[in-house]
């Protein structure tokens, strides 16, 4: 059985733990009193022999042996060995408790998913939950001595109502040399599938949820079976037991009080009762007894699990949930807080002291002075570092100082401040220096800068950067040219459209590179890098002659080589191409 003392330590008060020392059931005294009396008896027998039965020479030999044992007794790592062992045992003990099968979730699913108020529906639900309880009992009687004493055979399970005679015969037909705790779970799965095929379970998702919960309980039963089969290695238990008992066997000799007249170091007092030796025995052997009791919680000790109570409780609760409580709901009605947005449940006189306001945060009650709540100018506005994109990337700071209070748009227009302020003024900079200062003082340059910022195109605004698109592959994408585009290409000066190769004609002082597409598809200039080299092609689009009516309009054949042609000097800048209308392209 389990010793529960939770209510006695609910409040940490003076003597709350001390009162637990007076308990006997499940206490360390009940586990330790036998070994302690044996140790006490052996200690005083050795003391009596040393004092009364030995001669002077024999006493001298015994005293040397005592000093030797006392000096080397600390070499036994009893605390280290016991600490790891008890930690392992307690962890294993709690894991076994977490794997105890509780059918509460499964019975809720069976009661809600398996429909039917008729006799067949009731039989189906009760049979399903009885199979779950039968699987739990079969595994518990395999690992718990208390449950096995209650149900020593399968016939006892039939008499107790966990299994019908037909199911018992079906179980005996299997005749496998293994534990049969898994058989009821197979019956449960097949019966659930039959209920779904018969329309008792509406949706296959509900069937899957039911089988998932069944598998969870089946897994817990398998874990209990594995914990019972695989114990803590015997060698570890033996090492811990030998270390503890050999330590205190040595203490029987090494902790004896010697004759004070012989002035041995540490033996100035001749005490009858070795208090600290007895306390050490109480702690270390008691520590070992804790591991001995928790190593198998399915026994009959005071702190073992209440397995028989678990069997009774699970059967009673689960049958009630799937039978009498199926679709037996109370009438719905508005609660007492129906029209209250913030319900306030009442407190009794004994619990009124525990009423607390809602916690808003640890900084909720902090108060600041009025001066401390005023915003200060940002450090950026004071320093006003104005760097380009490369300077910002390299961490460089500008030495230009902008006036405080400038917003983000006026900061971007700061490089153009001088040109905006000097627009329409004489070229003599010294003559208009005072006027510029006056404009700065009156912040007139800001208004003019904002107007210029709004009226300027997007590509001319400071801070606008247009990066070319990076191709995803070295092979350029090819789009068939439209007729309108072909007509424009025919009108480009310096290109012979009748030729199959695309060539640029140099005019004036402009130097143009040649882009040829030969029959072999290689570039004429540096063919070894033709697959990665980009050529610059110049087109003169300033004077575009009209296309004659009798001009041959034939498709322009492009070369098959990997070439990216980039317009370099166009009469319109690149931003004009970006902002052009789709209809006029």
Curated annotation (Swiss-Prot):
It catalyses: chloride(in) = chloride(out); hydrogencarbonate(in) = hydrogencarbonate(out); 4-aminobutanoate(in) = 4-aminobutanoate(out); L-glutamate(out) = L-glutamate(in). Keywords: Calcium, Cell membrane, Chloride, Chloride channel, Ion channel, Ion transport, Membrane, Metal-binding, Phosphoprotein, Sensory transduction, Transmembrane, Transmembrane helix, Transport. The chain crosses the membrane at residues 32-51, 61-82, 238-255, 275-288. Residues 1-31, 83-237, 289-585 are cytoplasmic. It is a multi-pass membrane protein. Its main location: membrane. It is found in: Cell membrane; Basolateral cell membrane. The keyword Lyase does not apply. GO terms for biological process: gamma-aminobutyric acid secretion, neurotransmission; glutamate secretion; protein complex oligomerization; regulation of synaptic plasticity. Residues 52-60, 256-274 are extracellular. Ca(2+) binds at residues 10, 293, 296, 301, 304. Residues 346-379 are annotated as: Auto-inhibitory segment. GO terms for cellular component: basolateral plasma membrane; chloride channel complex; membrane microdomain; plasma membrane; presynapse. GO terms for molecular function: bicarbonate channel activity; intracellularly calcium-gated chloride channel activity; ligand-gated channel activity; metal ion binding. Ligand-gated anion channel that allows the movement of anions across cell membranes when activated by calcium (Ca2+). Allows the movement of chloride and hydrogencarbonate. Found in a partially open conformation leading to significantly smaller chloride movement. Upon F2R/PAR-1 activation, the sequestered calcium is released into the cytosol of astrocytes, leading to the (Ca2+)-dependent release of L-glutamate into the synaptic cleft that targets the neuronal postsynaptic GRIN2A/NMDAR receptor resulting in the synaptic plasticity regulation. The C-terminal auto-inhibitory segment (AS) modulates the open/closed conformation of the channel. In a closed conformation, the C-terminal auto-inhibitory segment constricts the channel concentrically by wrapping around the channel periphery in an inter-protomer manner. To allow chloride movement, the C-terminal auto-inhibitory segment opens partially, leading to significantly smaller chloride movement. Interacts with YWHAG; this interaction promotes the ligand-gated L-glutamate channel activity leading to the positive regulation of NMDA glutamate receptor activity through the L-glutamate secretion. Belongs to the anion channel-forming bestrophin (TC 1.A.46) family. Calcium-sensitive chloride channel subfamily. This is Bestrophin-1. It comes from Macaca fascicularis. The lineage of its organism: Eukaryota, Metazoa, Chordata, Craniata, Vertebrata. The gene is BEST1.
């Amino acid at each position: 059985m389990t010793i529960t003392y939770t209510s006695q330590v609910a409040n940490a008060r003076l003597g709350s733990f001390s009162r637990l020392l007076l308990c006997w059931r499940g206490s360390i005294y009940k586990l330790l009193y036998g070994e302690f009396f044996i140790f006490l008896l052996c200690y005083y027998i050795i003391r009596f022999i040393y004092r009364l039965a030995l001669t002077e020479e024999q006493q001298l030999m015994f005293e040397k042996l005592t000093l030797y044992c006392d000096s080397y007794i600390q070499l036994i790592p009893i605390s280290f060995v016991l600490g790891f062992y008890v930690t392992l045992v307690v962890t294993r003990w709690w894991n076994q408790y977490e794997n105890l099968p509780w059918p509460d979730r499964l019975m809720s699913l069976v009661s809600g998913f398996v429909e039917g108020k008729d006799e067949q529906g009731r039989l189906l639900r009760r049979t399903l939950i009885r199979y779950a309880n039968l699987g739990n009992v079969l595994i518990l009687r395999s690992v718990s001595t208390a449950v096995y004493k209650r149900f020593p055979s399968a016939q006892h399970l039939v008499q107790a109502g966990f299994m019908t005679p037909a199911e018992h015969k079906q179980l005996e037909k299997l005749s496998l040399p293994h534990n049969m705790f898994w058989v009821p779970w197979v019956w449960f799965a097949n019966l659930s599938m039959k209920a779904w095929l018969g329309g008792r379970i509406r949706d296959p998702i509900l069937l899957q949820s039911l089988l998932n919960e069944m598998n969870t309980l089946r897994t817990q039963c398998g874990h209990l079976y594995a914990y019972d089969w695989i114990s803590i290695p015997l060698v570890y238990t033996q090492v811990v037991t030998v270390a503890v008992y050999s330590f205190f066997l040595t203490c029987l000799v090494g902790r004896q009080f010697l004759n004070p007249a012989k002035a041995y170091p540490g033996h100035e007092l001749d005490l009858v009762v070795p208090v600290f030796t007895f306390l050490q025995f109480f702690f270390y052997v008691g520590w070992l007894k804790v591991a001995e009791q928790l190593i198998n919680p399915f026994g009959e000790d005071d702190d073992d699990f209440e397995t028989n109570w678990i069997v009774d409780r699970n059967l009673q609760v689960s049958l009630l949930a799937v039978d009498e409580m199926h679709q037996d709901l109370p009438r719905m009605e508005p609660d007492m807080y129906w029209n209250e947005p913030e319900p306030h449940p009442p407190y009794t006189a004994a619990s009124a002291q525990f009423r607390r306001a809602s916690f808003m945060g640890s900084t909720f009650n902090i108060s600041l002075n009025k001066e401390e709540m005023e915003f200060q100018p940002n450090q950026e506005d004071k320093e006003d570092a104005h760097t380009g994109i490369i300077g910002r990337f390299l961490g460089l700071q500008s030495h230009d100082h902008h006036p405080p209070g400038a917003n983000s748009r006026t900061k971007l227009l700061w490089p153009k401040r001088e040109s905006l302020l000097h627009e329409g003024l004489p070229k003599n900079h010294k003559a208009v220096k005072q006027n510029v200062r006056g404009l700065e003082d009156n912040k007139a340059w800001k208004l003019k800068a904002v107007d210029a910022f709004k009226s300027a195109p997007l590509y001319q605004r400071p801070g606008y950067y247009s990066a070319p698109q990076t191709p995803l592959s070295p092979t350029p994408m090819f789009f068939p040219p439209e007729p309108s585009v072909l007509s424009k290409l025919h009108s480009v000066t310096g290109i012979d459209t009748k030729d199959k190769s695309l060539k640029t004609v140099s005019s004036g002082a402009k130097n143009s590179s040649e882009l040829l597409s030969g029959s072999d598809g290689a570039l004429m200039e540096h063919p070894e890098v033709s697959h990665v080299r980009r050529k610059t092609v110049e087109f003169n689009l300033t004077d575009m002659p009209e296309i004659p009516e009798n001009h041959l309009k034939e498709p322009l054949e492009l070369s098959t080589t990997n070439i990216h042609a980039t317009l370099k000097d166009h009469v319109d800048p690149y931003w004009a191409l970006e902002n052009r209308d789709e209809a006029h392209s």
